[in-house]
Amino acid sequence: MEPLINGPGFVEALTDWVEATKYVPPGGINFGLGDEINSFGGGQTLFSFSWDDAFVAAMQDDSPIKNKVGAAPLPGSDRVWNRSSGAWENEYNQAPYIVWGWTAAVAKASKNQDVAFDYLCFFANDANHQADIAIGRFGVNPFKKSDFVPELYVERQGWDPEIAKQYADTLMEMEEGSTNRVFPLRVPGVFQFNSAIATATSKALAGQLSPQEALDEAAADWKKIVKRIGADTIREAYAVGVALEDNL
């Protein structure tokens, strides 16, 4: 099991990311999700590519740019690296935003299962859910079919009809029209893998390492993680995740 994270495609992506840092607001390289939501939602930044939390924050009544923003699918690339042939291909590629709802569970050992389930049902009822998706910092995104009806946002939140339609259509088109996606990694060691790539990319963004050097470092760390956990263990867990995706 060899990491591919330091291949040409990923290096090119990190190179683009480093280049993009020239255009971030002051301190933007170190933004967390909350900072990004507040910056775009408050009208301090022009463009946000993330979950739709920042867009929703921009459309709240307390935002200076309410009804002055737009939604569009995430941009793609006009070429891709084919790792099988070892060559670049001039083919457009675009990966979508994945519409997904939060999930919750009650522990089997809980002494108050009925109360816990009752609370979850209350918390997730339609009225509360629709209130939650209207507040950017809550991180509750549309995922029910009823969430993609533009009139919901026009009538309840005072959104401009054209912007509401653009928002709902953008999310629904990516959800229904794209199969070019992979869900987040769900294997033993996932947090270690993520931490290694976060550390490496941070060094590239700070100018301490080139994109290639940074991802070479990440690949070396990933090899250590695989050796520590076991390739077969990771492979088996990954297969379970893929099977789940194939049945959605």
Protein language model regions, located:
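Short helix-initiation/N-cap motifs at beta->coil->alpha
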Residues: 28-42
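Soluble non-cytosolic domains of exported or imported proteins
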Residues: 4-11, 31-34, 110-114, 187-195, ...
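C-terminal lobe and pocket-closing loops
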Residues: 54-65, 77-199, 234-248
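Paired acidic/hydrophobic, glycine-rich loop segments that form the ligand-binding mouth/hinge
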Residues: 46-51, 70-72
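Glycine-centered hinge/linker elements that transmit conformational signals in sensory
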Residues: 1-30, 73-79
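Short, charged, surface-exposed loops that flank catalytic or proteolytic processing sites
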Residues: 203-217
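Sec/Tat-exported extracytoplasmic proteins
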Residues: 18-25, 44, 52, 59-62, ...
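Short amphipathic alpha-helical coiled-coil/interface segments
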Residues: 14, 215-226
